[in-house]
Design a protein with these regions (language model features):
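Short, Lys/Arg-enriched N-terminal segments with co-localized hydrophobic residues
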Residues: 1-3
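Conserved ATP-binding subdomain of kinase catalytic cores across diverse folds
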Residues: 7-130
């Protein structure tokens, strides 16, 4: 485990194991100040960090779930092929199960991965619409 991985919460450390994602040999982590993005095969899972800032509040599971649902609803309008679902994460932080059953311990926005080099093209398509 790298030094950076040791600083991650147990849930994120555990979700870096590729066996959580069928047919995946490796998982890449991208962090922002408000989320963790787990890139796994054809999919990306965005998990909100439990933070409260002047411009947003992700401090509780309920608020993070609501924000995930809002993100899906808003972004699906322009990118329905990318924004797929809000999925629950179940079991325990040390042994999580994606899209399992029971009471969720966390939520993630499930997205289809895309080639980042296509972003300028996607922006232009959007600008052509407005």
């Amino acid at each position: 485990m790298t030094r950076m991985e040791k600083k991650l919460p147990p849930l994120i450390q555990a979700l870096l194991a590729p066996w959580h994602y069928p047919g995946v040999s490796g998982v890449e982590l991208v962090q922002t100040h408000i989320s963790w993005l787990l890139l796994a095969g054809d999919y990306a899972y965005k998990i909100k960090k439990p933070v409260k800032l002047p411009f947003l509040d992700f401090s509780t599971l309920e608020l993070r779930h609501r924000c995930c649902l809002d993100e899906l609803r808003l972004n699906r309008r322009l990118s329905p092929d990318i924004y797929l679902d809000v999925v629950g994460i179940f079991n325990t932080p040390q042994a999580p199960q994606l899209e399992g059953s029971g009471t969720p311990i966390e939520y993630a926005v499930k997205m289809r991965r895309f080639d980042a080099t296509t972003i300028p093209e996607r922006v232009q398509r959007y600008l052509d619409l407005v």
